[in-house]
Amino acid sequence: NYTSALNWPNENDYRFKSFWPADLHLIGKDITRFHAVYWPAFLLSAGIEIPKKIFAHGFILNKGEKMSKSLGNIEDPMELVDTFGVDQLRYFLMREAVFGNDGNYSDELLINRVNSDLSNDLGNLSQRCLSMVNKHCNKKVPEKNSLNDIDHELLSLPEAKIEKIFDMMDKFQINSYIEEVFYIVSK
């Protein structure tokens, strides 16, 4: 079980002390009853603290269907990483799979999301910023004291949203957090 991997029942072991109780026990929605009812009862009966939070995530659907070996529609994550890149795959899953709900996957959806958000929006913003620094700032990022009012206004956007963003992260609303980031990117 999870605690024996941390050298339990030796509660003085550094692994157990460092990692238990879990701040978050992340599980699939199909095993919620066991992990939210029975597992905590087992832990309590053994005198072990229960995880601080339990969160059940949805499934990643392949073209609208639950992935299944018998259906033959499973995607090998390592092949996806080799094809698209680990950061692109992580971004896609965090953006498209709303925690607690199912999310759809297809190569086409991944390619479109990465091209739209990362290449077009974020990539174009980066290119425009670097071009402006090159053209108007003698190829050096300007010091903060040399910025104008518009610069300061743009830089204040993330600061104004920081509390909202922390709240989203605490509630596992990662996709909403990403939407806030891309709202700022669009400005």
Kindly give the residue locations of the regions a language model identified.
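Structured secondary-structure scaffolds
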Residues: 1-135, 177-182
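Charged, amphipathic alpha-helical oligomerization/scaffolding segments
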Residues: 121-124, 128, 153, 157-160, ...
